[in-house]
Amino acid sequence: MEDQDAAFIKQATEAIVDVSLNIDNIDPIIKELLERVRNRQNRLQNKKPALIPAENGVDINSQGGNIKVKKENALPKPPKSSKSKPQDRRNSTGEKRFKCAKCSLEFSRSSDLRRHEKTHFAILPNICPQCGKGFARKDALKRHYDTLTCRRNRTKLLTAGGEGINELLKKVKQSNIVHRQDNNHNGSSNG
């Protein structure tokens, strides 16, 4: 199989050299193959494969067998700088991307990143007063409140812990209110 691949690559290289010298004497099948290669290269323009230099100004890709004719007058492009800050990532369309430090999620707005980062808190700030389930966002708590899941969780809590659960939930709710007041006070004094 390797001998066939080597023979094919040799024939293709010779055909490309012939193409670069005189386009009129090319087999129509070779012309079609070259058009396909050019179209594929246009689609994959951003991806630059590692090329192995060969004779006659022809480069052959070591992985995919792609063939590329070198232009003698082409100047090498300067290497791109990789000095990008983690917060200043940009996608292919040029818009900024904000990456979460704890997981691999990326967001197009910094506000979305801040909202997402709350999900990584050890103690979630919004606690359901009925079942004790914690939520990172208030809107998620509102959606959850008094749903079948909430009632099921409450039933499980009551059967597992008895009536002492109500007292525990009140303490959690009270400490949550105090925690929010402290955060609001600290945030307003820094502004």
Curated annotation (Swiss-Prot):
Which superkingdom heads the taxonomic lineage of this protein's source?
A: Eukaryota
Q: What is the taxonomic lineage of the source species?
A: Eukaryota, Fungi, Dikarya, Ascomycota, Saccharomycotina
Q: Which Gene3D superfamilies match?
A: Classic Zinc Finger
Supply the SUPFAM superfamilies for this chain: beta-beta-alpha zinc fingers
Describe its function.
Answer: Auxiliary transcriptional regulator of sulfur amino acid metabolism. Involved in the transcriptional activation of MET28.
Q: Name one GO cellular component term.
A: cytoplasm
Localization annotation: Cytoplasm; Nucleus
Protein name in the entry:
Transcriptional regulator MET32
Alphabetically, the GO molecular function entries are: cis-regulatory region sequence-specific DNA binding; DNA-binding transcription factor activity, RNA polymerase II-specific; RNA polymerase II-specific DNA-binding transcription factor binding; zinc ion binding
Where do the segments described as Disordered lie? 70-96
Query: Basic and acidic residues bias located where?
Result: 85-96
Q: Which GO terms describe its biological process?
A: negative regulation of transcription by RNA polymerase II; positive regulation of transcription by RNA polymerase II; regulation of mitotic cell cycle; regulation of sulfur amino acid metabolic process; regulation of sulfur metabolic process; regulation of transcription by RNA polymerase II
- Keywords for this protein: Cytoplasm, DNA-binding, Metal-binding, Nucleus, Repeat, Transcription, Transcription regulation, Zinc, Zinc-finger
The protein's predominant localisation is: cytoplasm
